[in-house]
Design a protein with these regions (language model features):
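Short, conserved catalytic/metal-binding motifs centered on acidic residues
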Residues: 41, 84-93, 122, 183-192, ...
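A short, flexible helix-boundary coil/loop motif
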Residues: 1-2, 9-18, 139, 228-270, ...
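Short amphipathic alpha-helical "interface-anchor" segments enriched in bulky aromatics
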Residues: 301-335
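Domain-level cores of phosphate- or acyl-group-handling catalytic modules
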Residues: 152-221
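Gly/serine-rich nucleotide phosphate-binding loop at the start of the catalytic core
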Residues: 1-56
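Electropositive, glycine- and tryptophan-enriched low-complexity nucleic-acid-binding patches
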Residues: 56, 110-181, 291-292
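Active-site-proximal, Lys/Arg-enriched surface segment
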Residues: 62-141
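An anionic, glycine-rich sequence signature occurring as long contiguous blocks
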Residues: 143, 209-314
Protein backbone atom coordinates (compact mmCIF):
# COMPACT_ATOMS: atom_id res chain seq x y z
CA UNK A 1 0.00 0.00 0.00
CA UNK A 2 2.86 2.40 0.77
CA UNK A 3 4.28 2.06 -2.74
CA UNK A 4 0.82 2.58 -4.23
CA UNK A 5 0.23 5.75 -2.22
CA UNK A 6 3.70 7.03 -3.09
CA UNK A 7 3.04 6.45 -6.78
CA UNK A 8 -0.18 8.44 -6.42
CA UNK A 9 0.96 11.43 -4.36
CA UNK A 10 4.42 11.79 -5.93
CA UNK A 11 3.22 11.36 -9.52
CA UNK A 12 3.62 15.06 -10.31
CA UNK A 13 7.16 15.38 -8.92
CA UNK A 14 9.31 16.11 -11.97
CA UNK A 15 12.31 13.89 -11.17
CA UNK A 16 12.60 10.20 -10.40
CA UNK A 17 15.16 10.84 -7.63
CA UNK A 18 12.63 13.11 -5.88
CA UNK A 19 10.01 10.38 -6.03
CA UNK A 20 12.52 7.84 -4.70
CA UNK A 21 13.58 10.09 -1.81
CA UNK A 22 9.95 10.86 -1.01
CA UNK A 23 9.21 7.17 -0.57
CA UNK A 24 12.39 6.69 1.48
CA UNK A 25 11.45 9.56 3.80
CA UNK A 26 7.89 8.29 4.16
CA UNK A 27 9.14 4.80 5.03
CA UNK A 28 11.36 6.36 7.68
CA UNK A 29 8.50 8.31 9.24
CA UNK A 30 6.53 5.08 9.53
CA UNK A 31 9.31 2.92 10.94
CA UNK A 32 11.85 5.03 12.88
CA UNK A 33 11.44 4.93 16.64
CA UNK A 34 11.65 8.13 18.63
CA UNK A 35 12.18 11.51 17.00
CA UNK A 36 11.72 11.48 13.22
CA UNK A 37 14.75 13.59 12.30
CA UNK A 38 16.47 13.44 8.92
CA UNK A 39 19.51 11.89 10.62
CA UNK A 40 17.47 9.17 12.30
CA UNK A 41 15.59 8.40 9.09
CA UNK A 42 18.81 8.14 7.07
CA UNK A 43 20.35 5.86 9.70
CA UNK A 44 17.27 3.65 9.87
CA UNK A 45 17.06 3.08 6.13
CA UNK A 46 20.65 1.85 6.29
CA UNK A 47 22.28 4.65 4.35
CA UNK A 48 23.88 7.24 6.64
CA UNK A 49 25.39 8.78 3.52
CA UNK A 50 21.85 9.66 2.46
CA UNK A 51 21.49 12.17 5.30
CA UNK A 52 22.74 15.14 3.30
CA UNK A 53 20.66 14.14 0.29
CA UNK A 54 17.48 13.76 2.37
CA UNK A 55 18.16 17.05 4.14
CA UNK A 56 18.35 18.81 0.78
CA UNK A 57 15.21 17.01 -0.41
CA UNK A 58 13.24 18.36 2.55
CA UNK A 59 14.77 21.76 3.26
CA UNK A 60 16.28 23.05 0.03
CA UNK A 61 14.65 21.24 -2.88
CA UNK A 62 12.21 22.88 -5.27
CA UNK A 63 9.38 20.34 -5.31
CA UNK A 64 5.97 21.81 -4.60
CA UNK A 65 4.38 20.45 -1.43
CA UNK A 66 0.96 21.70 -2.55
CA UNK A 67 1.03 19.28 -5.48
CA UNK A 68 1.56 16.40 -3.05
CA UNK A 69 -1.09 17.70 -0.66
CA UNK A 70 -3.62 17.99 -3.46
CA UNK A 71 -3.02 14.35 -4.43
CA UNK A 72 -3.25 13.31 -0.77
CA UNK A 73 -6.52 15.23 -0.44
CA UNK A 74 -8.01 13.44 -3.43
CA UNK A 75 -6.84 10.11 -1.99
CA UNK A 76 -8.52 10.85 1.36
CA UNK A 77 -11.64 12.04 -0.44
CA UNK A 78 -11.99 8.51 -1.81
CA UNK A 79 -10.77 6.51 1.20
CA UNK A 80 -12.22 8.50 4.10
CA UNK A 81 -15.31 9.93 2.38
CA UNK A 82 -15.15 12.87 4.78
CA UNK A 83 -18.27 14.44 6.22
CA UNK A 84 -16.43 17.69 6.87
CA UNK A 85 -13.12 19.51 6.82
CA UNK A 86 -12.02 19.96 10.43
CA UNK A 87 -9.64 22.72 11.50
CA UNK A 88 -7.12 21.62 14.14
CA UNK A 89 -4.65 24.15 15.61
CA UNK A 90 -1.37 22.74 16.94
CA UNK A 91 1.09 24.34 19.36
CA UNK A 92 4.66 23.07 18.86
CA UNK A 93 6.95 24.14 21.76
CA UNK A 94 10.48 25.12 20.70
CA UNK A 95 13.61 25.86 22.72
CA UNK A 96 15.20 28.35 20.30
CA UNK A 97 13.97 31.37 18.33
CA UNK A 98 15.29 30.78 14.82
CA UNK A 99 13.02 28.02 13.51
CA UNK A 100 10.44 29.41 11.13
CA UNK A 101 7.44 30.95 12.87
CA UNK A 102 8.78 30.48 16.40
CA UNK A 103 8.02 33.13 18.99
CA UNK A 104 6.39 33.70 22.35
CA UNK A 105 2.64 33.10 21.99
CA UNK A 106 -0.11 33.03 24.58
CA UNK A 107 -1.80 29.63 24.47
CA UNK A 108 -5.36 29.83 25.86
CA UNK A 109 -5.58 26.10 26.57
CA UNK A 110 -2.43 26.31 28.73
CA UNK A 111 -3.10 29.75 30.20
CA UNK A 112 0.48 30.86 29.62
CA UNK A 113 2.94 32.21 27.08
CA UNK A 114 4.87 29.47 25.29
CA UNK A 115 7.83 29.83 22.93
CA UNK A 116 6.43 27.85 20.05
CA UNK A 117 5.39 27.38 16.47
CA UNK A 118 1.66 27.67 15.92
CA UNK A 119 0.31 25.59 13.04
CA UNK A 120 -3.23 25.17 11.73
CA UNK A 121 -4.17 21.95 9.94
CA UNK A 122 -7.27 21.16 7.90
CA UNK A 123 -8.32 17.53 8.12
CA UNK A 124 -10.64 15.22 6.20
CA UNK A 125 -12.84 13.55 8.82
CA UNK A 126 -15.69 11.14 9.29
CA UNK A 127 -16.94 9.48 12.48
CA UNK A 128 -14.38 6.65 12.30
CA UNK A 129 -11.13 8.24 11.14
CA UNK A 130 -9.48 11.38 9.93
CA UNK A 131 -6.33 12.59 8.23
CA UNK A 132 -4.58 15.96 7.84
CA UNK A 133 -4.19 17.42 4.36
CA UNK A 134 -3.39 21.12 4.32
CA UNK A 135 -1.36 23.26 6.71
CA UNK A 136 -0.53 26.87 7.52
CA UNK A 137 1.85 28.48 10.00
CA UNK A 138 0.27 31.29 12.01
CA UNK A 139 2.96 33.96 12.18
CA UNK A 140 3.49 36.61 14.85
CA UNK A 141 4.35 40.25 14.25
CA UNK A 142 8.11 39.60 14.29
CA UNK A 143 7.77 37.35 11.26
CA UNK A 144 5.24 39.35 9.30
CA UNK A 145 6.66 42.83 9.79
CA UNK A 146 10.45 42.65 9.68
CA UNK A 147 12.11 39.27 10.24
CA UNK A 148 15.51 39.56 11.87
CA UNK A 149 18.65 38.92 9.80
CA UNK A 150 19.29 35.21 9.50
CA UNK A 151 15.64 34.27 9.99
CA UNK A 152 14.11 31.94 7.36
CA UNK A 153 12.36 33.74 4.53
CA UNK A 154 8.58 33.35 4.33
CA UNK A 155 6.73 33.95 1.02
CA UNK A 156 4.38 36.92 1.28
CA UNK A 157 1.19 34.91 0.50
CA UNK A 158 1.94 32.81 3.59
CA UNK A 159 2.13 35.73 6.03
CA UNK A 160 -1.12 34.89 7.83
CA UNK A 161 -1.42 36.40 11.29
CA UNK A 162 -4.47 34.71 12.78
CA UNK A 163 -5.83 31.21 13.10
CA UNK A 164 -8.90 32.32 11.16
CA UNK A 165 -6.84 33.53 8.19
CA UNK A 166 -4.87 30.28 8.25
CA UNK A 167 -7.96 28.09 8.57
CA UNK A 168 -9.98 29.82 5.88
CA UNK A 169 -7.13 29.93 3.38
CA UNK A 170 -6.21 26.28 3.89
CA UNK A 171 -9.83 25.06 3.78
CA UNK A 172 -10.66 26.97 0.60
CA UNK A 173 -7.49 25.65 -1.03
CA UNK A 174 -8.28 22.06 -0.02
CA UNK A 175 -11.83 22.30 -1.35
CA UNK A 176 -10.44 23.55 -4.65
CA UNK A 177 -8.11 20.55 -4.87
CA UNK A 178 -10.80 17.91 -4.39
CA UNK A 179 -13.69 19.71 -6.13
CA UNK A 180 -17.35 18.87 -5.74
CA UNK A 181 -19.91 20.52 -3.47
CA UNK A 182 -18.26 22.43 -0.59
CA UNK A 183 -18.05 20.39 2.59
CA UNK A 184 -18.78 21.98 5.97
CA UNK A 185 -15.78 23.36 7.85
CA UNK A 186 -15.74 22.52 11.57
CA UNK A 187 -13.78 24.98 13.70
CA UNK A 188 -12.93 25.65 17.33
CA UNK A 189 -10.90 28.87 17.34
CA UNK A 190 -11.43 30.59 20.72
CA UNK A 191 -9.76 33.84 19.68
CA UNK A 192 -11.59 34.25 16.36
CA UNK A 193 -14.34 36.87 16.07
CA UNK A 194 -17.55 34.95 15.23
CA UNK A 195 -18.87 37.69 12.93
CA UNK A 196 -15.57 37.84 11.02
CA UNK A 197 -15.59 34.05 10.76
CA UNK A 198 -19.14 34.01 9.39
CA UNK A 199 -18.32 36.69 6.82
CA UNK A 200 -15.11 34.96 5.74
CA UNK A 201 -16.73 31.60 5.04
CA UNK A 202 -19.80 33.18 3.47
CA UNK A 203 -17.50 34.98 1.03
CA UNK A 204 -15.80 31.65 0.25
CA UNK A 205 -19.13 29.87 -0.25
CA UNK A 206 -18.26 27.24 2.37
CA UNK A 207 -20.65 26.21 5.16
CA UNK A 208 -19.27 26.12 8.70
CA UNK A 209 -19.90 24.84 12.22
CA UNK A 210 -17.92 26.93 14.71
CA UNK A 211 -17.62 26.57 18.47
CA UNK A 212 -18.17 29.97 20.10
CA UNK A 213 -17.87 31.33 23.64
CA UNK A 214 -21.05 31.57 25.65
CA UNK A 215 -20.49 35.33 25.86
CA UNK A 216 -20.94 35.75 22.08
CA UNK A 217 -23.59 38.39 21.35
CA UNK A 218 -26.41 37.15 19.12
CA UNK A 219 -29.89 38.32 18.15
CA UNK A 220 -32.76 35.82 17.83
CA UNK A 221 -34.76 35.96 14.62
CA UNK A 222 -38.22 34.72 13.74
CA UNK A 223 -40.89 33.53 16.15
CA UNK A 224 -38.64 31.26 18.21
CA UNK A 225 -38.83 33.42 21.34
CA UNK A 226 -42.23 34.90 22.07
CA UNK A 227 -41.88 38.16 23.94
CA UNK A 228 -38.18 38.70 23.26
CA UNK A 229 -37.52 42.32 22.36
CA UNK A 230 -35.19 41.41 19.48
CA UNK A 231 -32.11 42.96 21.02
CA UNK A 232 -28.81 41.15 21.26
CA UNK A 233 -28.03 38.88 24.18
CA UNK A 234 -25.35 36.34 25.03
CA UNK A 235 -25.41 32.90 23.44
CA UNK A 236 -25.54 31.25 26.88
CA UNK A 237 -28.47 33.36 28.03
CA UNK A 238 -30.41 32.79 24.83
CA UNK A 239 -29.89 29.03 24.95
CA UNK A 240 -30.97 28.94 28.57
CA UNK A 241 -34.22 30.60 27.51
CA UNK A 242 -34.96 27.81 24.99
CA UNK A 243 -33.81 24.87 27.12
CA UNK A 244 -37.34 23.44 27.18
CA UNK A 245 -36.85 22.65 23.47
CA UNK A 246 -33.96 20.27 24.17
CA UNK A 247 -33.85 16.85 22.51
CA UNK A 248 -31.65 13.83 23.18
CA UNK A 249 -28.94 13.16 20.57
CA UNK A 250 -26.51 10.22 20.53
CA UNK A 251 -22.94 10.41 19.25
CA UNK A 252 -19.79 8.28 19.43
CA UNK A 253 -16.94 9.41 21.65
CA UNK A 254 -13.72 8.63 19.68
CA UNK A 255 -11.61 8.54 22.85
CA UNK A 256 -13.66 6.14 24.98
CA UNK A 257 -15.29 4.41 21.97
CA UNK A 258 -18.65 4.61 23.73
CA UNK A 259 -22.01 5.97 22.67
CA UNK A 260 -22.81 9.21 24.46
CA UNK A 261 -26.07 11.12 24.80
CA UNK A 262 -26.38 14.89 24.95
CA UNK A 263 -29.35 17.21 25.14
CA UNK A 264 -29.35 19.81 22.37
CA UNK A 265 -31.44 22.78 21.35
CA UNK A 266 -31.09 25.29 18.57
CA UNK A 267 -32.47 28.70 17.70
CA UNK A 268 -32.21 30.92 14.57
CA UNK A 269 -29.99 33.95 15.20
CA UNK A 270 -28.01 36.69 13.55
CA UNK A 271 -24.67 38.19 14.51
CA UNK A 272 -24.05 41.93 14.84
CA UNK A 273 -23.25 43.44 11.47
CA UNK A 274 -24.43 40.40 9.49
CA UNK A 275 -27.72 39.41 7.89
CA UNK A 276 -26.98 35.81 7.01
CA UNK A 277 -29.33 33.41 8.84
CA UNK A 278 -27.48 31.26 11.35
CA UNK A 279 -28.42 28.65 13.92
CA UNK A 280 -27.13 28.74 17.49
CA UNK A 281 -26.79 25.19 18.84
CA UNK A 282 -26.35 24.36 22.51
CA UNK A 283 -25.32 21.13 24.23
CA UNK A 284 -26.24 20.10 27.76
CA UNK A 285 -24.72 17.02 29.41
CA UNK A 286 -26.25 17.23 32.89
CA UNK A 287 -29.09 18.81 34.79
CA UNK A 288 -27.62 22.30 34.67
CA UNK A 289 -29.86 24.84 32.96
CA UNK A 290 -26.83 26.44 31.29
CA UNK A 291 -25.41 24.77 28.15
CA UNK A 292 -21.99 23.16 28.36
CA UNK A 293 -20.96 24.15 24.83
CA UNK A 294 -22.40 26.15 21.97
CA UNK A 295 -21.82 26.48 18.24
CA UNK A 296 -22.85 28.77 15.41
CA UNK A 297 -23.53 27.42 11.93
CA UNK A 298 -24.97 28.60 8.65
CA UNK A 299 -26.42 25.10 8.10
CA UNK A 300 -29.71 26.50 9.32
CA UNK A 301 -31.83 23.73 7.76
CA UNK A 302 -29.78 20.84 9.19
CA UNK A 303 -31.45 18.96 12.08
CA UNK A 304 -29.87 19.39 15.48
CA UNK A 305 -28.62 15.80 15.76
CA UNK A 306 -26.55 15.73 12.56
CA UNK A 307 -25.31 19.23 13.37
CA UNK A 308 -24.02 18.14 16.78
CA UNK A 309 -22.37 15.07 15.27
CA UNK A 310 -20.62 17.32 12.75
CA UNK A 311 -19.33 19.49 15.60
CA UNK A 312 -18.07 16.39 17.43
CA UNK A 313 -15.77 15.53 14.51
CA UNK A 314 -13.26 17.84 16.19
CA UNK A 315 -12.93 15.16 18.88
CA UNK A 316 -12.21 12.54 16.20
CA UNK A 317 -9.41 14.73 14.84
CA UNK A 318 -8.00 15.49 18.28
CA UNK A 319 -7.88 11.79 19.14
CA UNK A 320 -6.21 10.86 15.84
CA UNK A 321 -3.66 13.66 16.18
CA UNK A 322 -2.66 12.45 19.65
CA UNK A 323 -2.62 8.74 18.77
CA UNK A 324 -1.20 8.84 15.24
CA UNK A 325 0.21 12.18 14.09
CA UNK A 326 2.57 12.54 17.03
CA UNK A 327 3.87 9.02 16.35
CA UNK A 328 4.73 9.67 12.69
CA UNK A 329 6.76 12.82 13.33
CA UNK A 330 4.20 15.56 12.67
CA UNK A 331 5.85 17.93 15.17
CA UNK A 332 9.43 16.65 14.83
CA UNK A 333 10.86 18.92 12.13
CA UNK A 334 14.10 20.46 13.42
CA UNK A 335 15.17 22.68 10.52
CA UNK A 336 14.94 26.43 9.95
CA UNK A 337 13.55 26.31 6.41
CA UNK A 338 9.96 27.43 5.75
CA UNK A 339 9.77 25.04 2.80
CA UNK A 340 11.36 22.32 4.88
CA UNK A 341 8.67 22.60 7.53
CA UNK A 342 5.94 22.33 4.90
CA UNK A 343 7.55 19.40 3.07
CA UNK A 344 8.13 17.46 6.28
CA UNK A 345 4.58 18.15 7.48
CA UNK A 346 3.19 17.07 4.10
CA UNK A 347 5.00 13.73 4.23
CA UNK A 348 4.04 13.23 7.88
CA UNK A 349 0.41 13.78 6.81
CA UNK A 350 0.82 10.99 4.25
CA UNK A 351 2.34 8.74 6.94
CA UNK A 352 -0.67 9.49 9.14
CA UNK A 353 -3.05 8.52 6.31
CA UNK A 354 -1.34 5.17 5.83
CA UNK A 355 -1.30 4.42 9.55
CA UNK A 356 -4.99 5.21 10.00
CA UNK A 357 -6.06 3.25 6.93
CA UNK A 358 -4.41 0.09 8.23
CA UNK A 359 -5.08 0.25 11.94
CA UNK A 360 -7.62 -2.31 13.21
CA UNK A 361 -11.17 -1.10 12.69
CA UNK A 362 -11.90 -1.76 16.37
CA UNK A 363 -9.58 1.12 17.26
CA UNK A 364 -11.61 3.48 15.14
CA UNK A 365 -15.11 2.63 16.33
CA UNK A 366 -16.83 0.40 18.85
CA UNK A 367 -18.15 -2.99 17.78
Amino acid sequence: MLSELCAEIFAQLPRSDQRRKGEMYLRGLLSVGGRKSVRNIATHVGDRAAEQSLHHFISASTWDWNTVRAALGRHLERSVRPRAWVVHPVVIPKAGRHSVGVGPRFVPSLGQVVNSQHAVGVWAANDERSGPVNWRLSLGDDWRDAPLPGYPQVPEPELAATDLECAAGAAVELQGWVGGPPRPVVLDLPQADPAALARRFAAAGMPFVAAVPGSTRVTPVGPALVGHDGRGTSAHQLLRMVRTLRRAVTWTDPVTLTTRTSLVAGIPVQLPGTRRPLVLLGEWTGKDSWPRRCWLSDLADTPWGPLLRLAKLSLRVGADFAAVSTQVGMVDFEGRSFGGWHRHTTLASAAHALTVEYRPRALARPA
